Amino acid sequence: MGSAELTARLAAEGLRPGSWANGPGDVYAAHVHAFDKVLVCAAGSIVFGLPGRGEVAALRPGDRLDLPAGTVHEAVVGPEGVTCLEAHLPAGALAPPPLRRPAGEW
């Protein structure tokens, strides 16, 4: 499933995603947001750590991660880099806890 199809699927839910990309091994330190976030891996891979929950969510193309506002998360980009689609929602639009949805299941 390509980026255009993933964008269309998110748009069908009323979301307006942007995209971003990072190189192999890039790291995002633990942080939180005041808004809900929907992430979809479009290419490559990325592993999100959820330190407050003691969980890890590995995303490959087509996988989705819903992060409610206030969720502490960190990430490490895979060896081939990553391109993700990201949409923001008002805090409270997504029900906790964070939810990883594999490709084909959302």
Model features per residue range: what roles?
Residues 1-19, 74-106:
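Double-stranded beta-helix
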Residues 16-33:
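Conserved short histidine dyad/triad with adjacent acidic residue
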Residues 27-28, 65, 69-74:
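Histidine-centered metal-chelating micro-motifs
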Residues 32-48:
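Short, conserved beta-strand element in jelly-roll/cupin
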Residues 49-51, 76:
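A generic structural motif
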Residues 53-69:
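Short acidic-glycine-tyrosine-enriched beta hairpin
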